[in-house]
């Protein structure tokens, strides 16, 4: 086996390398295979996160003194008297605040004071702490000296040289600055006196520790919720939410491959709400004891990000072939988009991190909230939304199977009007909603907060302290493994002190910046328990700990149950596949009840009905979906000579053609409906096509039966089927000047066509538009006159004809009679050429495909060649043809990225060559090729002499060798066959038996597989019989007197026909069949 790739003038062997399943593929496949279980698990986990945040909010509202306070905003100092605060300032120089001595002494003093407070019943509600930088401090020592009384570590420098040295060490705008550790206590009015007594007594008992550090008579100030956090005009926010819900719903309405539009819209809103509350819960658990974030805009920003991720996943899943199983489609879509979604998340987190250096603390807190929300939302998107989407696709496939006529495609009258505002769903808007929204709102918050503080727009100066505190907060868990107590940003709001400090420093403007305390990163759990023994804090701590532990236990139990019930892989544990998403190579024999070799096979267009005729002159019609026989005709019931067999597009009727008579049989209610004579030359071969006509209803149908003779004569019959019976009449007759090599039917959206390739090299296309058939000879390419035509193949829905020449293949648009593209291919053997297109769909009047594949036998080397033209990106597509806007063809939604549209020159070429096979058959999507070859039981392929010797014993040649032209019984033939078997057994003294194997190649997974075929009889077979594609992933190959259906992509064989093994579906189908049989039993007899 040799695999190589050609693309844009370069060879890339890595393109054909097998792609191993990633962790994301295993994860998504596991969820999509058991969606309801994971929906339950993630719902419980979300409830735990939401409930803990509601507990925090309820505790904050329960205490009236906290109902109007928020620690998220620390800059506003104008407030009403609701909460009394006491602030103690531990001041020092900008350099000393980072020294180990300063931090140790500050922490020791704070711990001692809190223990002292605990002895008196801890009369304060809580304490809030922050690091404060006050700048600028003038360069002159005389102006700074009055502030020195607030420093506890050391006095300020006594000479100007040291002042200049200090100024060089500063990090705040290049000026000298004064740093402080502020302890803010929020007290109830009745607790103020007690707090004063305890504070004075503590200071008097510790004269050597911070004797001059405090303002011994702290000013009573007020904390409040600034105007920015108060929600005015709720109806505007609710109206915006309703509008956003409508926009998202209409976006999903335009996705016709999604069934539950309202359900998925609600899922995204619920998922965003879960992320919002879970973020509040996480921040509350690790840091905050105040109310939850009061900004409604944060919720909508989370929704915008969910829209980005959801539509990225939806586009990938819709672009995957619909014939694959739902878990496989989810797996491929999630695996292809997880990297893009994760990179988008990283970009947003990096942007928020950079912005945090240039915004005020309240906006920093908002950035922190958004960052945490984005992470939680990303995790929920990859779990909860993934499971809900898999359920919805399953329901859509069930609905399409049960009643395709009741599809909701364009079912709403107002859907076409969305085309006028389609710019609202442009790819750029959908892909950048979250990015644009959070940038705009962060800028808005910075503008409003800076206006409140400075009176004008201003960015904060970059300060390294934010990075230091962030590092310590992360290191608290990852490195030091110490738990940060329930602390939030403090509040620096003593107007008296600020005014006094402003006068003493003679500074016109004081810029105040608050930061979380670095020193508190050294507080461990034991010290926290000893120090923070407030009733509110202890209760909050217990609730948060309980629900967080429950969160982890739920997830662990879910994984354990999943592993015990089904295992990590939902495939058969006895399977030889080692990876979870590696799909099955399946061979299923069809017991078609033939006793001799099968000569002819046929399948309906909907892959529902399969028919076969053998040397025993028996006809068997098989229902592939129900896996049962529908019609069996014995030799006595069949015509003496059978020239052709054909099934109608729906698989309900079968036509048989003898040398001068045609028969129409009903397959559903087995009976002969019609018998009619026709003209046919004695030695000519027939090719018969059913063309759809006018259908008034299920009780009156019209077809056109086109009979093509190899001599060049074409007859068109009009067939009408009613309840009372059927009628047929010859309506057209054509005669070509030379014999026909090959003829095909093309039932396109615009016309019914028959294309014929003659021995003279002409390609004549007969088209019916309206009541008249009109012929036309194709002559678009100048090479037509000089090169020999080898084969033709059509893509019906695209109205495209592929013409194989000596030097390549031409793709011709039959609608416009135009040459679209020429592919350079090696010489093709006659009647071995086939074409497949993957993921075909109609979008906005365009017929789009993801790839084009050619499979044929080389005319010189007799080797099977497979050419694939596509792109590694699963969202890329090619436009084969375009039509005017028509309701039955047009999908209003455009699920594809317009940037992913490729031209034929941009396609990558992948070539696969099978050296030890001479025949093959390709699936209709062009992604799988199958073949059958013979080898000995020892695994060695037979030699040419062995093949020639076996040709004498094959039943296929038995008719010519024994002279049984008019068979009247099976006995003489079977007796002769048993004698030949005995001779064969004596000839092969080694006792070797024939072994056949099926080989396949999967372009989608770059895999080559072989599997031995079980022999169900003792027939000696030289070559396999006819073969044809049965579905997008399945083919039928004849071997002797039985048919092997070969597929790749599912362990359950019925999955190849887009049927799911559901008990509910089986019950519905059985009920519908019984009703149909009762209806027909009274009108049509067998």
Curated annotation (Swiss-Prot):
Disruption phenotype: Cells show absence of mature sre1 as well as inability to grow in the absence of oxygen. Forms a tight complex with scp1, composed of 4 copies of scp1 and 4 copies of sre1. The keyword Iron does not apply. This is Sterol regulatory element-binding protein cleavage-activating protein. It comes from Schizosaccharomyces pombe (strain 972 / ATCC 24843) (Fission yeast). GO terms for cellular component: cytoplasmic side of endoplasmic reticulum membrane; endoplasmic reticulum; endoplasmic reticulum membrane; Golgi membrane; SREBP-SCAP complex. The keyword Protein biosynthesis does not apply. GO terms for biological process: cellular response to hypoxia; positive regulation of ergosterol biosynthetic process; regulation of cholesterol biosynthetic process; SREBP signaling pathway; steroid metabolic process. PANTHER family: STEROL REGULATORY ELEMENT-BINDING PROTEIN CLEAVAGE-ACTIVATING PROTEIN (PTHR46378:SF1). Residues 57-229, 287-290, 359-367, 444-544 are lumenal. WD repeats lie at residues 593-632, 637-675, 680-727, 736-776, 963-1009. InterPro entries: HMGCR/SNAP/NPC1-like_SSD, SCAP, SSD, WD40/YVTN_repeat-like_dom_sf, WD40_repeat_dom_sf. Escort protein required for sre1 processing at low sterol as well as oxygen levels. May regulate export of the scp1/sre1 complex from the ER at low sterol or oxygen levels. 4-methyl sterols bound to scp1 may mask an ER export signal in scp1 leading to retention of the complex in the ER. Residues 1-35, 251-265, 312-337, 389-422, 566-1086 are cytoplasmic. GO terms for molecular function: sterol binding. Signal peptide: none annotated. Glycans are attached at residues 94, 168, 454. It comes from the Eukaryota. Pfam families: Sterol-sensing. A motif (ER export signal) lies at residues 396-401. The chain crosses the membrane at residues 36-56, 230-250, 266-286, 291-311, 338-358, 368-388, 423-443, 545-565. Residues 233-391 form the SSD domain. Changing residue 680 to S: In Scp1-M4; reduced interaction with sre1. It is a multi-pass membrane protein.
């Amino acid at each position: 086996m040799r695999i190589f790739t050609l693309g844009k003038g370069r060879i890339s062997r890595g393109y054909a390398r097998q792609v191993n399943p990633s962790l994301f593929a295993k994860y998504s496949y596991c969820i999509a295979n058991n969606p309801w279980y994971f929906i339950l698990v993630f719902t419980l986990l979300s409830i735990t996160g939401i409930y803990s945040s509601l507990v925090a909010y309820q505790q904050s509202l329960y205490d009236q003194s906290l109902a109007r306070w928020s620690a998220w905003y620390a800059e506003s100092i104008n407030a009403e008297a609701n909460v009394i605060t006491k602030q103690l300032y531990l001041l020092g120089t900008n350099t000393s605040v980072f020294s180990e001595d300063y931090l140790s002494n500050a922490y020791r003093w704070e711990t001692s004071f809190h223990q002292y407070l605990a002895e008196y019943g801890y009369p304060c509600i809580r304490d809030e702490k922050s690091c404060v930088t006050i700048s600028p401090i003038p360069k002159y020592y005389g102006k700074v000296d009055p502030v020195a009384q607030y420093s506890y570590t050391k006095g300020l420098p006594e000479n100007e040289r040291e002042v200049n040295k200090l100024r060089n060490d500063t990090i705040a705008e290049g000026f000298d600055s004064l740093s402080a550790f502020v302890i803010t206590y929020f007290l109830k009015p009745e607790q103020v006196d007690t707090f004063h007594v305890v504070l004075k007594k503590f200071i008097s008992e510790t004269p050597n520790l911070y004797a001059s550090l405090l303002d011994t008579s702290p000013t009573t100030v007020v904390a409040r919720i600034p105007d920015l956090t108060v929600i005015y005009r709720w109806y505007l926010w609710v109206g915006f939410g309703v509008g956003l819900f409508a926009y998202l719903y209409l976006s999903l309405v335009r996705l016709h491959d999604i069934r539950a539009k309202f359900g998925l819209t609600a899922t995204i809103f619920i998922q965003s709400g879960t992320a919002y509350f879970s973020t509040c819960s996480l921040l509350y658990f690790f840091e905050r004891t105040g109310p939850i974030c009061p900004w409604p805009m944060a919720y909508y920003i989370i929704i915008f990000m969910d829209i980005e991720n959801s539509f990225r996943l939806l586009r990938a899943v819709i672009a995957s072939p619909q014939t694959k199983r739902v878990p496989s489609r989810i797996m491929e879509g999630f695996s292809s988009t997880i990297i893009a979604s994760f990179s988008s998340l990283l970009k947003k987190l990096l942007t928020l991190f950079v912005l945090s250096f240039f915004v005020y603390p309240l906006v920093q807190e908002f950035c922190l909230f958004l960052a945490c929300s984005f992470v939680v939302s990303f995790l929920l998107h990859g779990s909860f939304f993934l499971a809900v989407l898999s359920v919805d696709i399953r329901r859509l496939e069930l609905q399409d199977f049960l009643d395709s006529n009741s599809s909701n495609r364009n079912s709403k009258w107002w859907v076409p009007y969305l085309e006028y505002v389609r710019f609202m769903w442009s790819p750029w808007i959908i892909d950048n909603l979250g990015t644009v929204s959070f940038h705009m709102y962060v800028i808005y918050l910075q503008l409003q907060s800076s206006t409140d503080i400075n009176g004008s727009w201003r960015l904060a100066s970059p300060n390294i302290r934010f990075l230091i505190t962030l590092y310590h907060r992360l290191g608290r868990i990852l490195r030091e493994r110490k738990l940060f107590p329930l602390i939030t940003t403090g509040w620096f709001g003593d107007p008296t002190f600020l005014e006094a400090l402003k006068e003493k420093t003679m500074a016109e403007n004081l810029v105040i910046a608050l930061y979380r305390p670095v020193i508190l990163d050294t507080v461990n759990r034991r010290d926290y328990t000893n120090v923070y023994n407030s009733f509110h804090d202890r209760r909050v701590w217990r609730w948060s700990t309980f629900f967080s532990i429950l969160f982890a236990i739920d997830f662990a139990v879910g994984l354990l149950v999943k592993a015990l019930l089904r295992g990590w892989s939902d495939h058969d544990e006895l399977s030889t596949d080692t990876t979870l998403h590696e799909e099955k190579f399946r061979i299923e024999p069809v017991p078609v009840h033939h006793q001799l070799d099968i000569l002819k096979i046929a399948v309906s267009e909907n892959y529902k009905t399969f028919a076969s005729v053998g040397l025993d002159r028996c006809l068997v019609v098989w229902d592939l979906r129900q896996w049962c026989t529908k019609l069996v005709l014995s030799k006595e019931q069949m015509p003496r000579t059978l020239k052709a067999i054909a099934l109608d597009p729906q698989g309900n009727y079968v036509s048989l053609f003898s040398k001068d008579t045609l028969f129409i049989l009903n397959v559903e209610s087995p009976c002969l409906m019609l018998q009619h004579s026709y003209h046919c030359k004695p030695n000519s071969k027939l090719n018969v096509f059913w063309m759809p006509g006018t259908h008034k209803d299920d009780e009156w149908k019209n077809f056109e039966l086109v009979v093509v003779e190899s001599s060049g004569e074409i007859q068109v019959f009009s067939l009408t089927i009613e309840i009372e019976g059927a009628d047929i009449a010859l309506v057209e007759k054509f005669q070509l000047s030379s014999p026909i090599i090959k003829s095909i039917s093309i039932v396109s959206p615009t016309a019914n066509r028959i294309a014929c390739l003659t021995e003279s090299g002409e390609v004549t296309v007969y088209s019916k538009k309206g009541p008249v058939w009109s012929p036309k000879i194709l002559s678009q390419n100048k090479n037509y006159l000089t090169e020999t035509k080898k084969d033709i193949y059509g893509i019906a829905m695209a109205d495209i004809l592929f013409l194989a020449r000596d030097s390549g293949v031409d793709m011709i648009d039959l609608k416009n009679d135009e040459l679209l593209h020429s592919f350079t291919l090696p010489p093709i053997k006659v009647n071995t050429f086939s074409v497949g297109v993957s993921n075909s769909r109609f979008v906005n009047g365009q017929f789009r495909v993801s790839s084009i594949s050619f499979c044929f036998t080389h005319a010189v080397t007799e080797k099977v060649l497979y050419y694939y033209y596509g792109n590694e990106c699963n969202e890329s597509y090619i436009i084969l043809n375009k039509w005017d806007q028509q309701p039955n063809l047009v999908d209003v939604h455009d699920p594809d990225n317009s940037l992913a549209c490729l031209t034929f020159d941009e396609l990558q070429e992948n070539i696969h060559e099978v050296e030890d096979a001479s025949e093959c058959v390709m699936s209709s999507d062009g992604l799988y090729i199958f073949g059958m070859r013979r080898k000995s039981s020892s695994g060695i392929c037979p030699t040419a002499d062995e093949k020639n010797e076996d040709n004498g014993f094959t039943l296929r040649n038995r008719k010519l060798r024994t002279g049984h032209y008019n068979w009247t019984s099976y006995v003489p033939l079977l007796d002769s066959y048993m004698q030949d078997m005995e001779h064969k057994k004596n000839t092969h003294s080694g006792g070797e038996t024939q072994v056949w194997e099926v080989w396949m190649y999967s372009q989608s997974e770059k895999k080559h597989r072989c599997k031995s075929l079980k022999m169900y009889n003792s027939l000696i077979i030289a070559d396999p019989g006819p073969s044809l594609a049965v579905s997008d992933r399945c083919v039928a190959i004849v071997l002797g007197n039985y048919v092997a259906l070969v597929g790749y992509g599912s362990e359950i064989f019925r999955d190849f026909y887009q049927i799911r093994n559901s008990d509910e579906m089986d019950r519905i189908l059985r009920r519908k069949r019984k009703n149909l049989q009762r209806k027909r039993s009274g009108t049509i007899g067998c």
